[in-house]
Each structure stands twice: as structure tokens, then as C-alpha cells.
């Protein structure tokens, strides 16, 4: 017989975070602000993808970006040069954002007059997938050089995302062991409802379809 108590800390943390995330999601819905949580590994092209996306949409809607990093404000500076509002969130060593940190950023930012807010999460394929940020939709970027086996190695990330961008398709000829068919099959096996776009943030390939997806989702959300 045990003479001590076992506390499931991880379960409690997730339960508390999920409740906070649901509350934040409801608040954003009442404001009509669509929050996209954008995730990837470091170097997959989040910021470059975001800059091209902003250039395509900023004349149609009011956009804001929250940049999350352990340190530095390089990405926030790059985004601010596009002309949209941007803030930098330093996570203090944390490898992800949770709902409370997202709420703090939202408060500082002020989103009531924004249609579309992108949260560029910390570059990591593990921790960000575990914590609900309160976002409307989750998106991730997988770059061709990372390999088509990433859905097998990081299944949770691919399971929780509404949309997956396969980036750097302009160098597919160099990485000829990357199979578009295999990566698509592996993603859909984990997540049959996921939308998948093959894109290049460098050339713009696939960005018309990606931008149309954003327009459609925001339109449905704000009705």
C-alpha cells in the first residue's frame, strides 16, 4: 500500500491550458478575429512564407502577426517591414506557446480591429503540438530538405494541423528522394481531413491556393 500521493502534473497542466484555450477561442470568435497558429521546425521557412502571404492579403484584410521565439526580435522586424502590425513574444526558454502566453500577446497587441492574426510559434515539431494556443486553426510547414518521413517521426504535429504546407518545392529536383506522393499519403493516414499545399515561398508556387484557403476560412468564420 502506498503511503504517498501521486500527482499527475502533466495532465493537470494540459487540462488547465485546454480550458483557457477554449475561453480565448470564444473571445476571439466574438470579435471576429481569426487566429492561425503557424508551426514548423527551425529553417522550414515560416517567416518567408508569412511575408509572401501578407503581401497577397494585406490589401484585403487587416492583418497582425505575433512572433514567438526564445530570444531575438529578428523575425518581428522582418514582418514589420511588410507594413502590418507585429509584436515579438519572448518565451523565456520555453519551447512553445500555451494559451496563457498567447492571451498575454493578444492583450498587448489588441485584436478587435484585426481580421487575421498569425501566431508564428517557436520552431519545434514536438512541444508546440502539445499545447492548444486558443487558435482558430492550426497550420504547419514541412520543408522538402527535412524529408518525407517526418509524419512518421512526429505524428502528433501532423495530426492536429488543419493545413500542411510542403515548402521549398522549387528544390525538389535536388532532393530527389523526397516523394510528394509518400508524404501526402502519410499525412492523410494520420489526419484524413488535412488540407495539403505544395508551395515555394521563394517562387510563389502554390500560394494562390494557400491564399484562397485563408480567404475561404476567414469568410466562413466571420459569418
Task: Please place each PLM-identified region on the residue numbering.
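Phosphate-binding/switch region of NTP-binding enzymes
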Residues: 156-158, 165
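Canonical P-loop GTPase G-domain recognition
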Residues: 172-223
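Short beta->alpha connector loops at strand-helix junctions that form conserved
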Residues: 88-91, 142, 167
Amino acid at each position: 500500500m502506498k503511503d504517498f500521493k501521486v500527482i499527475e502534473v502533466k495532465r493537470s497542466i494540459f487540462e488547465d491550458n485546454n480550458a483557457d484555450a477554449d475561453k480565448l477561442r470564444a473571445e476571439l470568435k466574438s470579435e471576429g478575429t481569426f487566429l492561425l497558429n503557424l508551426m514548423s521546425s527551425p529553417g522550414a521557412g515560416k517567416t518567408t512564407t508569412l511575408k509572401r502571404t501578407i503581401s497577397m492579403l494585406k490589401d484585403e484584410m487587416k492583418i497582425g502577426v505575433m512572433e514567438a521565439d526564445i530570444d531575438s526580435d529578428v523575425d518581428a522586424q522582418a514582418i514589420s517591414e511588410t507594413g502590418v502590425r507585429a509584436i515579438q513574444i519572448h518565451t523565456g526558454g520555453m519551447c512553445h506557446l500555451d494559451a496563457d502566453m498567447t492571451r498575454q500577446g493578444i492583450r498587448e497587441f489588441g485584436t478587435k480591429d484585426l481580421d487575421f492574426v498569425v501566431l508564428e510559434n517557436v520552431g519545434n515539431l514536438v512541444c508546440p503540438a502539445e499545447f492548444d494556443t486558443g487558435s482558430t486553426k492550426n497550420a504547419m510547414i514541412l520543408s522538402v530538405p527535412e524529408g518525407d518521413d517526418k509524419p512518421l517521426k512526429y505524428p502528433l504535429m501532423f495530426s492536429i494541423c488543419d493545413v500542411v504546407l510542403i515548402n521549398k518545392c522549387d528544390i525538389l529536383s535536388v532532393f530527389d528522394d523526397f516523394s510528394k506522393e509518400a508524404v501526402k499519403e502519410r499525412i492523410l493516414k494520420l489526419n484524413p481531413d488535412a488540407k495539403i499545399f505544395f508551395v515555394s515561398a521563394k517562387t510563389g508556387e502554390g500560394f494562390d491556393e494557400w491564399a484562397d484557403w485563408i480567404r475561404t476560412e476567414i469568410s466562413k468564420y466571420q459569418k
